[in-house]
């Protein structure tokens, strides 16, 4: 058993209480410090069996029989006496003043040590100083206290030092509060572990002024306690451990012994330099503790915390030639058991305050909620090197890595070493207590007179439950060590988890939040700590959260795959948007340009504006939905889960409304194409059944405009009111035709044949005419209504392509033109002009007919004068779209006889006269013109006598079915339809020309005959 201790005295100067932070100023002289440390003691056990007595037991880990001897060349009176049988050893050494001021810095768990270069005095020791000043003028007394193996109590410090510590005791709390605090902090360790380890006591003491006594084992009123141990990697861990846990034991006996032994030598050690002696002794400790030959069992120490007292335990922990003044405050009821891989996390968490240089202090919460702690030392390297290995801590093992150590301040030749530490916490399952194995000298609190303390079971249970809940979170934490940088990447991001359960802020324990009742810590120390914390956290914030970010971020491969998928979906969405956009433009183009199939005359101005507005509305809605889908795809929503991008429904609704309205508005439009046939030839176009089907589906308005020149001659023939060929069946579905069809129960004109239309002629109707003759009452009605709105129309044909609406308006300006519409076809161009007064229209026809417009003469004719004709008794074709006004011409002039308006009628009359003798003879002039038309192959050779079955009147069919169902209620609908089919077959395949009553009778007869069979 070997132990070394250093006594620090300073009778002239006072050390400032700055919350554990030393200031290298006038109030602090680092050269006047005495350290109390252990050289051969590897572990300490705080044992309080049966509550009888508080004791601090230490077990010697080093098993070397040879003890390191400090070189006497630089230490005049330094000597190490090691004796396992003796209880005390004294060494006195004299060292010279160092060249550079001894500053220290605690930078992210890394101690920077200043020392001057010199030769290594002893190859068996690890010297942290490379050189010492040759002049040694200070004397330091080193005391080795080798305590008995059975245990020596250290609990009577307050009574022995009462006389000399009067001033100090006034600033602290009273004895009662200290005893209560001490009794709550300590607990008996298990008897099993107490038997396996030897006990020794390593205390830190400091005399600040001439009137001070030794305060051993824990809380020093002047906050100048010193903590030190053999294994160098464990010193830093021990510092934090002592700060957080404040191991409270009774130190009266040890205090008495130390006081009796050291009081005679107090005055001698006033002005002695402690740094050199300390580091010489520390080298020996480092060598023994890290020697490969020492493989002793690590002792365990039971640590409990319950209540923080008003006095702050300030321990001066030194590493190398740096002395760290630490305030150790305890958190109530924090006795817990840690897994072995939790201690480093807890220890590193508290020391996240990194100072770049100068005096600094360890954080007060070095080990938050500490329980069982085991400190392992680093193995000694084979040969001395200024580079001391650092520790890379994993879950259950420490890995030695090379690292360089440097000092922050000092001479340029100084070599620095930074020795990292490793803390491995192991949980000791004990129902009564939590035991921590500590391989270093533990700082124990002074000013405590209690003999023993018992930690309540509730405190232990509560803390255990808290730690068990956090075990899963800390299980996988791995840490790496970099030179002069942070120990743990996840250190700062785990602050909240490692905070005490009672901490309202959730962060590690600090002096600010652990103030005992009635007392407060030094405000300067708190402010200084805050400054250091802020500076270091800003500097290392990126590294602190690096581990957490790496765990949360998926692999690079997954990221690339996701990006490619999103990119592909965005491309597909863009394609859909472009297709919909083009589709809208295509529909717009069809409506604007492809008017021949719809037989409509699109007004250039108003129609285009309305259609353009509808198109813009559809495109705007399309773009809005496209942007919404694009944003969702960017958020990671699969495209297949989103609604498709389509504009069909909205597009159709917008354009269908527009088209239907446009068709009604254009009912007044003109078909002046036939007026230009005087010196022109019509194209030879046959009647197409597909066109008939299209016309039947379009439900034409009777007043719809005449198509352009290229329209089928069928429509031209149908414009004759005397040539009814039954096309009214195409518009029987129209609501406007109900009044016409309700007048008769006949199916079509049942008293006549379908192709044998009634040609009841009058002298007026058969007279030669210039224009078309609308015979349908609906046509007349709509024409009159339209005439009231738009006035009277004239047809201007033969326009050249260069004629514009402005040209026509300028030529017809004096006639007060209300509206102008220009229509184009493949080979013909014409215009329709509306006038408010009939007189203006007639005057325009007379004056402007034959006038040249842009170099080409035009033909002008009046097309509508309502009320100048009477309708025939029968309805004419529903496809007749002419609104032309009848101009009676009694002159049988050849030119008049050859008018285009009589060509279809004459041709129809000729065909009918050849087939049926019922027709009266026609005028010779008309026949001549018809023969000319026939020879020119202008009209088809066959009459229009075929009507497809699907064009039958659905309303008449409904009536027939209703009557047959009433007459034959027991017969199904299918049989009734079969009967109608038989009637149609028997009537040469047509029901046209038969009345509804006749059809019903014939179908009923067939059904009765079928029933009889």
Curated annotation (Swiss-Prot):
Family annotation (InterPro entries): Nucleotide-bd_a/b_plait_sf, RBD_domain_sf, RRM_dom, TTC3/DZIP3/RBM44-like_helical
Q: Where is the composition biased (Polar residues)?
A: 78-94
For this UniProt record, give its keywords in alphabetical order, as a comma-separated list.
Answer: Cytoplasm, Phosphoprotein, RNA-binding
Span of domain RRM: 792-865
Q: Does the keyword Amino-acid biosynthesis apply?
A: no
Q: Gene3D superfamilies attached here? A: 3.30.70.330
Q: Which SUPFAM superfamilies match?
A: RNA-binding domain, RBD (SSF54928)
Q: Please summarize what the entry says happens upon disruption of the gene.
A: No visible phenotype. Null male mice produce an increased number of sperm and show enhanced fertility.
Q: Could you name the Gene Ontology cellular component terms for this entry? A: cytoplasm; intercellular bridge
Q: Which GO terms describe its molecular function?
A: protein homodimerization activity; RNA binding
- Output the Pfam families linked to this UniProt entry: RRM_1 (PF00076), TTC3_9th (PF24905)
**Which SMART domains does the record cross-reference, listed alphabetically?**
RRM (SM00360)
Compartments annotated for it: namely: Cytoplasm
Q: Where is the composition biased (Basic and acidic residues)?
A: 56-76
Q: What is the role of the protein in this entry?
A: Component of intercellular bridges during meiosis. Intercellular bridges are evolutionarily conserved structures that connect differentiating germ cells. Not required for fertility.
The protein's name: RNA-binding protein 44
The record lists the organism as: Mus musculus
């Amino acid at each position: 058993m070997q132990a070394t201790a250093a006594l620090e005295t300073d009778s002239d100067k006072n050390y400032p209480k700055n919350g554990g932070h030393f200031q290298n100023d006038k109030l602090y002289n680092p050269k006047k410090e005495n350290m109390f440390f252990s050289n051969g003691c590897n572990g300490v056990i705080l044992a309080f069996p049966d509550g009888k007595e508080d004791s601090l037991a230490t077990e010697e880990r080093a098993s070397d029989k040879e003890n390191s001897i400090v070189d006497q060349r630089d230490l005049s009176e330094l000597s190490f006496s090691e004796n396992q049988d003796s209880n005390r050893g004294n060494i006195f050494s004299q060292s010279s003043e160092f060249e550079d001021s001894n500053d220290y810095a605690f930078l992210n768990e890394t101690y920077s040590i200043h020392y001057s270069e010199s030769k290594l005095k002893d190859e068996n020791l690890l010297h942290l100083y490379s050189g010492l000043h040759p002049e040694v003028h200070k004397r330091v007394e080193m005391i080795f206290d080798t305590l008995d193996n059975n245990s020596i109590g250290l609990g009577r410090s307050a009574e022995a030092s009462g006389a000399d510590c009067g001033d100090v005791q006034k600033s602290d709390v009273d004895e009662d509060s200290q005893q209560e605090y001490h009794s709550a902090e300590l607990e008996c360790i298990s008897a099993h572990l107490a038997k396996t380890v030897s006990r020794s006591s390593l205390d830190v003491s400091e005399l600040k002024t001439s009137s001070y006594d030794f305060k051993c084992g824990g809380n020093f009123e002047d906050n100048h306690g010193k903590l030190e141990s053999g294994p160098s990697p464990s010193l830093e861990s021990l510092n934090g451990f002592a700060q957080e846990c404040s191991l409270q034991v009774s130190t009266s006996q040890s205090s008495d012994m130390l006081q009796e032994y050291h009081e005679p030598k107090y005055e001698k050690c006033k002005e002695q330099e402690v740094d050199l002696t300390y580091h010489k002794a520390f080298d020996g400790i480092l060598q023994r503790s890290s020697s490969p030959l020492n493989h002793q069992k690590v002792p365990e120490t039971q640590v409990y915390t319950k209540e923080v007292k008003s006095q702050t335990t300030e321990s001066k922990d030194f590493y190398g030639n740096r002395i760290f003044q630490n305030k150790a405050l305890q958190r109530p009821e924090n006795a817990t058991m840690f897994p072995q891989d939790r201690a480093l996390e807890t220890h590193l968490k508290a020391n996240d305050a990194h100072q770049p240089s100068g005096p600094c202090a360890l954080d007060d919460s070095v080990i938050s909620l500490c329980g069982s702690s085991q400190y392992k030392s680093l193995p000694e390297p084979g040969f001395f090197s200024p580079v001391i290995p650092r520790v890379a801590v994993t879950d259950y093992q420490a890995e030695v890595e090379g690292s360089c150590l440097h000092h922050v301040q000092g001479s340029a030749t100084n070599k620095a070493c930074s020795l990292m530490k490793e803390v491995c916490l192991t949980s000791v399952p004990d129902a009564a207590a939590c035991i921590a194995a500590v391989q270093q000298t533990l700082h124990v609190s002074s000013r405590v007179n209690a003999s023993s303390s018992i930690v309540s079971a509730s405190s232990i249970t509560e803390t255990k439950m808290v730690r068990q809940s956090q075990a899963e979170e800390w299980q996988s934490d791995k840490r790496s060590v970099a030179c002069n940088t942070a120990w743990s990447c996840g250190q700062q991001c785990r602050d909240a988890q490692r905070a005490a359960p009672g901490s309202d802020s959730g962060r590690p324990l600090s002096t600010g939040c652990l103030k005992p009742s009635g007392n407060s810590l030094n405000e300067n120390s708190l402010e200084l700590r805050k400054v250091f914390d802020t500076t270091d956290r800003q500097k290392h914030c990126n590294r602190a959260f690096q581990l957490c970010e790496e765990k949360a971020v998926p692999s690079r491969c997954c990221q690339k795959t996701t990006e490619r998928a999103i990119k592909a979906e965005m491309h597909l969405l863009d394609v859909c948007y472009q297709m919909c956009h083009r589709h809208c433009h295509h529909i717009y183009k069809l409506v604007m340009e492809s008017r021949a199939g719809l037989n409509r005359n699109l007004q250039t101005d108003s129609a285009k504006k309305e259609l353009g507005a509808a198109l813009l509305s559809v495109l705007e809605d399309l773009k809005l939905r496209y942007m919404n889908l694009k944003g969702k795809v960017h958020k990671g929503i699969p495209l297949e889960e989103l609604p498709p991008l389509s504009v069909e429904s909205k597009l159709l609704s917008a354009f269908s409304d527009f088209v239907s309205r446009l068709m009604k508005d254009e009912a007044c439009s003109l078909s002046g194409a036939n007026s230009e046939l005087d010196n022109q030839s019509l194209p030879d176009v046959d009647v197409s059944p597909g066109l008939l089907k299209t016309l039947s589906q379009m439900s034409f308005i009777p007043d719809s405009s005449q198509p352009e020149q290229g329209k089928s001659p069928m429509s031209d023939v149908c414009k004759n009111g005397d040539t009814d060929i039954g096309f009214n069946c195409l518009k029987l579905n129209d609501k406007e035709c109900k009044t016409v069809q309700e007048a008769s129960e006949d199916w079509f004109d049942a008293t006549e044949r379908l192709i044998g239309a009634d040609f009841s002629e009058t002298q007026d109707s058969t007279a030669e005419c210039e224009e078309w003759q609308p015979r349908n009452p609906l046509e007349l009605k709509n024409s009159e209504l339209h005439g009231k709105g738009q006035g009277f129309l004239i047809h201007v044909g033969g326009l050249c392509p260069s004629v514009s609406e402005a040209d026509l308006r300028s030529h017809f300006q004096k006639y007060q033109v209300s509206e102008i519409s220009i229509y184009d076809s493949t080979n013909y161009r014409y215009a329709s002009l509306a006038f408010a007064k009939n007189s203006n229209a007639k005057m325009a026809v007379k004056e402007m007919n034959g006038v040249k417009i842009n170099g080409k003469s035009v033909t002008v004719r009046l097309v509508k004068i309502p009320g100048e004709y009477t309708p025939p008794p029968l309805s004419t074709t529903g496809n007749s779209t002419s609104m032309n006004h009848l101009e009676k011409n009694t002159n049988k002039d050849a030119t008049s006889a050859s008018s285009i308006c009589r060509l279809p009628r004459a041709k129809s009359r000729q065909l009918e006269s050849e087939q049926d003798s019922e027709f009266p003879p026609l005028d010779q002039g008309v026949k001549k013109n018809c023969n000319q038309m026939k020879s020119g192959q202008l009209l088809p050779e066959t009459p229009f006598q075929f009507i497809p079955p699907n064009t039958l009147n659905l309303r008449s069919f409904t009536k027939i079915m209703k009557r047959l169902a009433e007459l034959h209620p027991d017969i199904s609908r299918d049989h009734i339809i079969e009967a109608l089919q038989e009637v149609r077959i028997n009537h040469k395949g047509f029901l046209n020309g038969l009345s509804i009553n006749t059809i019903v009778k014939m179908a009923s007869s067939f059904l009765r005959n079928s029933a009889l069979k």
